[in-house]
Amino acid sequence: MNPTLKNQARNVSPGTIIRGKWHHCKYRTVRLLGHGANGNVYLAESSNGRVAVKIGRESMSITSEVNVLKQFSRVQGNVLGPSLIDVDDWVTTDGTHPFYVMEYLRGQPLLSFIREKGEEWIGILTVQLLADLDRLHREGWVFGDLKPDNLLVSGPPPRVRWFDVGGTTLIGRSIKEYTEFFDRGYWGLGSRKAEPSYDLFAVAMIMLNSAYPKRFDRKKEGQRQLREALYESKALARYRRVITSALEGKYADAPSMRQDMVKAMSVPPSKPKRTSRTQSRKLKKQTKKSREWLQTFLFAAFLFVAYFLYLFGAH
């Protein structure tokens, strides 16, 4: 691709024809799918059906993302991300724009799927996501900008997939792209070093986001604020220990968090505590039952002793 490119990704209107400079393939845009720091992703029509086209801001970031997608394709049983289809440059009157074409993943946004299907899917999809992250981490990468906006639920059967790898970073380097709500640095709970625990923090925040779809800004000490939000959510009650451990960076790898998630899913949600009035009423009933049982026991004992004395006196 051309190394001398504009710094800004081009905004493309529906119906625009994107023609590759080198491979000469044509793509007609349908609508915007998403946007990020490195460029915009569009749904487009091609000679082979619908595809997703990402138009980048500069060549280096696009090359990096293409390398990640190629790496994904070498993972056995790959379901980590979309398949890479084409890489090219698009020449327009205002410059040359790098782009790549990938498989269009049909699905439903993660949060709307959970809202429609029910909160029990929070755990199921999180376990799936952690399994995929484990494979990504073992290949030497972290996702980086992990958030619901980059996740879809495809199927049936329902399967969580990610479609924008713009923030994917080699382990050991600095995270190159992030969103504040899902960034542990923003909450004062860790660095922006690319390591598995960075992604696992984001997984915990995705679970919080499922309970608080509108998200919220940091207004106090980060750990305290997140803990308060967690304990106010009934939907996340059974996952509190797992989420807390992920927020505090206690998981070194995805399998450890996944194992605890599976355990948490097997335990029924805790019942709400009874009010003091309810407890008092229950205590009175228990006291009354105990008194009645004692009276019955004493009467039975009296009959037994009386019968024994009767037999003893008969001889």
Specify the residue positions occupied by each region the protein language model found.
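Activation segment signature within eukaryotic-like protein kinase domains
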Residues: 125-126
